[in-house]
Amino acid sequence: MPLDGVYDRLTDVGYAYGPAFQGLRRVWRGDGEIYAEVALPEEQRADAGRYILHPALLDAALHPLLPGVADQDRAALLPFAWSGVTIHATGASVLRVRLTLTGSDVAALTVADATGAPVASVESLLLRPLSKDALRQAASTARDGLFRIAWNTLPTTDTPTDTTDTTGWAVVGDLTVDGASRHADLGAVANADSVPDTVLYAPPVPDGDVPEAAHAALRDALSTTQSWLADDRTTDTTLVVVTRGALATREGQHTDPVQAGLWGLLRVAQTENPGRIALLDTDTDTIPTTALTTDEPQLALRDNTFHTPRLARTTDQPTDRPRWDRGTVLITGATGALGTVLARHLVTQHGTRHLLLLSRRGTNAPGAQELQQELTALGATVTITACDAADRHALTSVLDDIPAEHPLTAVVHTAGVLDDTVLADLTAERLEKVLRPKVDAAWNLHELTKDHDLEAFVLYSSIAGLIGNAGQANYAAGNTFLDALAQHRRALGLPAVSLAWGLWAQASTISGQLDQTDLRRLARLGLLPLSSADAMDLFDAAPATGEAVLAATRLDLGTLRKQGAH
């Protein structure tokens, strides 16, 4: 039987298996019997001898019983009771399996190794049915897949003291630090007779409208950071980049999205160049001499108190959930993989009846017309329009055409592109390419809809901006801009949430560029893929947290603890 895409299909109905558990190799169907060959991945086979029967291999042996594998109409079933279990051999890494169906919910199991030698037999395996809704509820990550960014007060034992010697410090920019030498620019620091141990640098804040200023600030930061990191004279000097009010450390604080973008870019610089750069966001131009006597790479100073960012569990708050079944819902990037998943979800689960789907190619995008037909058949009125939301005039025209009888009530911005490379090789052109659909489009959506009575304004951000994923300085910068924009809107009393997505199992413009090496690297970092079903559970659960910025991801907390991650 064909197995192409079988685990993607299983993921979509709630069975999310990681690479180690995707063991099905071949399946045959006979009269009342199913035959299968299952195997451990190469990297897992060395562990087979540690088990009587490797758990991933045993699990894979039952995968032919899952919905849509050997039987398209099979209901979701779970193993409930085993009887008559006999073990003949241990340590197998490849199995040949015969499943004999003795009833609608009973099967016998015979297992051999690759040579045909007996491994195990099960006289009776009792299965229990499980509805798809129950399966999704059981598999849902909504309770443990949403994380807020908590700015924790620095513990007293780690709080800097007032005895800091600043004679080895230098200042560049609009800052005041007692005892530190002042230089015109970072080049002057590198050219000094004695290069300081620590340099506090306040990047200039460009004039112009917000998107223009954000682009200019990030171009300047990219060039400055590249020059600093490439200069052998500064390899032993810590560069502390100081922003002012870029981020919100608590609900209701105003942010500066222009400076917030710097945090995304520089978090990647930190990842790629450990120990070279620190980040400090302040509410004052006068920096206490205690600011850098801690090992924390990222700090916020508020009212003379230091705070450090951590991911923390969310809790539900008494807040209204958005109504997706009234008015028109606008989705950007709507014909991409993530936008398509969302559009289907809103129509089938929330009763959305008027969708305005924007993408650069409109109905010429692959699958766009089929999506329109599918959602129309479900009772929705679907308009797919070719529009680059970063083009303010084009977006204005589209918004003006929304009929008054179905006014705009929600915006979801999913658009984005990747152009990954290490920071040292990143060019201004590649930076601009990635920023445009994030910064320009999101700001246009904000400004052009801020006077509408919106139920929801959702930004699809990325955890890359929060953790500084190596090779994604441009993408991280665009996404921390989105996070700050959500906080900016909330401070204005407008609806907004920025979802910093982790890895999706669903193939997309973003995840589709990841090979198996990338996926294993992310797994080692503790990032696991989200099924489309789980991602939509998180989408639905996000408003109840009351947070403006959320990391929406599956995390392997055991892996994170082993790494000493926070």
Stretch-by-stretch model annotation:
Residues 1-297, 302-306, 321-565:
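4′-phosphopantetheine-dependent carrier domains
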Residues 313:
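Glycine/aspartate-rich loop-and-adjacent alpha/beta segment that forms the canonical ThDP
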Residues 317-319:
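N-terminal flanking helix/linker immediately upstream of nucleotide/cofactor-binding cores
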